[in-house]
């Protein structure tokens, strides 16, 4: 029936947050715990989850979600959790706790062995989905600040499930033509919605390039295009901006996003606000990059702040007209090698709601000037 019905504005998407209890503000949006709980409760056929690692038992709310998944699997609901081969540290414990859940490890880059599965998303019954920066860990569900999107619009869920099928084809145990050649470029009907054909103003973007498939948009192309076309404002809330790519222990300069930010500030007078994370998961280059942006654009309208509580939110807003939510840092290694799916929207309401989140975070007591 989809071809004969118009898509609702925003494809029925709602923003989803995890806020640690020690923050000085609360969220008006669905929590990640509530989102995952709803997906499990409403599931009738299947629940598919993609995450770099799986450690839900590390917090009470994470354990509650895993127990709900266990109950669903015991009722006959098919549950598959995709993990990166290098993120399976807790796999044995989880399998013994719930043998009915199918855990599959993937290696999206057997040829060079540098790419990881970074994608953080859930799909159920081709009807509901979550995509964002909350991995399937207790921290992401309870104690680390994250941002994502939940939709119960079936066409969008179906489109995200196609990405799950792509990653699943890179099963690290089984051999297939996909993981033998590290290429999924010929996957049929790999996406229905993209930058030239959004649904309700919403579309997904993908990375890395060798996993694109037919008609998918490369995430870095869309992000850089939006940065380069910005006219008035760019707001970025990210764990890290790192203009390098690491291969075999060596670092190589990857200035694409970094230069696009500088050009927007200096050449076009765009107002830029950058809110970066500052915790132990940061790349060593992250703060140096933030400081260099601040120094290079000292005579321009570019401001940098540091968020002092664990913050894995990865958010980009351009001209108050476009929002991008992802699981990857603005990091050359992530964009060149790792596998993930990002959420994009030009829907006015979704952009406005994301902007309010950024403004709240920017003025909060947890955001400190880089110069302090």
Curated annotation (Swiss-Prot):
Membrane-protein topology: Lipid-anchor
Residues linked to a lipid group, S-palmitoyl cysteine type: 185-186
Record's catalysed reaction(s): a 1,2-diacyl-sn-glycero-3-phosphocholine + H2O = a 1,2-diacyl-sn-glycero-3-phosphate + choline + H(+)
Occurrences of domain PLD phosphodiesterase (ranges): 307-334
Keyword NADP: no
Keyword vocabulary terms for this entry: Host endoplasmic reticulum, Host Golgi apparatus, Host membrane, Host-virus interaction, Hydrolase, Late protein, Lipoprotein, Membrane, Palmitate, Viral budding, Viral budding via the host ESCRT complexes, Viral envelope protein, Viral release from host cell, Virion
Post-translational modification remark: Palmitoylated. Attachment of the palmitate moiety is essential for correct intracellular targeting and protein function.
Record's note on what induces expression: Expressed in the intermediate phase of the viral replicative cycle.
Gene Ontology molecular function, alphabetical: hydrolase activity
EC number: 3.1.1.-, 3.1.4.4
Motif stretch (YPPL): 153-156
GO biological process, one term: viral budding via host ESCRT complex
InterPro entries: Diverse_PLD-related, PLDc_3, PLipase_D/transphosphatidylase
CC terms in the record's Gene Ontology section: host cell endoplasmic reticulum membrane; host cell Golgi apparatus; membrane; viral envelope; viral membrane; virion membrane
Domain statement: Late-budding domains (L domains) are short sequence motifs essential for viral particle budding. They recruit proteins of the host ESCRT machinery (Endosomal Sorting Complex Required for Transport) or ESCRT-associated proteins. F13 contains one L domain: a YPPL motif, which might interact with PDCD6IP/AIP1.
Subunit structure: Interacts with protein OPG190.
UniProt record similarity statement: Belongs to the orthopoxvirus OPG057 family.
Function summary: Major envelope protein that plays a role in the biogenesis of the viral double membrane and in egress of virus from the host cell. Produces the wrapped form of virus that is required for cell-to-cell spread. Acts as a lipase with broad specificity including phospholipase C, phospholipase A, and triacylglycerol lipase activities.
Record's protein name: Envelope phospholipase OPG057
Gene symbol of the encoding locus: OPG057
